A protein has these predicted regions:
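Pre-Walker A (Motif I) flank of P-loop NTPase domains
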Residues: 26-32
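Conserved P-loop NTPase "ATPase switch" module shared by AAA+ and STAND
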Residues: 86-110, 124-129
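Conserved NTP-binding/hydrolysis module of P-loop NTPases
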Residues: 2, 54-58, 65-84
Length: 219
């Protein structure tokens, strides 16, 4: 399988969200929310973007507290408390990507800490959550009103699926095979696993392409 980061429409929209946050005027909050069902590539995209934009990527957990947050962020900033974190980010703004934000829904103090960091520094902060994250965050009106960019990751269309297969697979999939996959699978993880399975089958059987008929026999 080719090691390529495929820029699906979701990825392009995520890039657009980050760019919009970076370029917003100072008087507009630079807080964004990306949400969607599992398996669509949100976490992989967030990590890729954090590297691309020299940002900070953190994965939340149900044990995460405001204090833990202020200990974790400084690992990237060589700072040791809130005031120094703020000072460092003012000197050299970095986007902060908080994945699995759902774990923080019942920990408003931690969410407030992130809001305060954005208020003080203007550094973009992007929350990444599951399908109902936007509904859950609506409970925190003071925070939700600060979301200037909100993006939902959608299931893949046929064009995205074709792009994923064509760029990742080392064996050709016929159009009817791609349509067959589209009718049954819409999660990135599922698609990648399927491509890997079909590549191995093609290699073991000296095949140069995968057809719908072959897939129906195997799956």
């Amino acid at each position: 399988m080719n090691k390529i980061f495929v820029k699906t429409q979701n990825v392009k929209n995520f890039i657009g969200l980050v760019e919009n946050l970076i370029n917003k005027p100072q008087n507009i909050p630079k807080i964004g929310l990306v949400y969607g069902e599992p398996g669509l590539g949100k976490s992989q995209t967030a990590l890729w973007l954090a590297c691309k934009y020299d940002g900070i990527y953190l994965r939340a957990s149900n044990l995460m507290t405001g204090r833990w947050l202020l200990e974790e962020i400084p690992r990237f900033l060589t700072s040791d408390n809130f005031n120094i974190v703020v000072k460092k980010l003012k000197q050299s703004p970095q986007g902060i990507f908080i994945d699995e934000i759902d774990y923080l829904m019942n920990n408003y103090k931690t969410i407030e800490t992130l809001r305060d960091i954005n208020d003080e520094t203007g550094s973009p902060i992007i929350f990444i959550g599951m399908g109902l994250a936007h509904r859950k965050l609506e409970r925190y009106k003071h925070l939700y009103d600060r979301f200037s960019e909100i993006l939902k990751f959608e299931t893949f269309g046929i064009n995205d699926l074709s792009r994923i297969i064509n760029q990742l697979s080392e064996v050709r999939f016929t159009p009817d095979a791609t349509e067959y996959i589209f009718s049954k699978y819409n999660r990135f993880r599922q698609i990648v696993q399927l491509i890997n399975q079909m590549e191995n089958f093609a290699k073991d059987n000296n095949l140069t392409e995968i057809t719908k008929e072959i897939m129906e026999q195997i799956l």
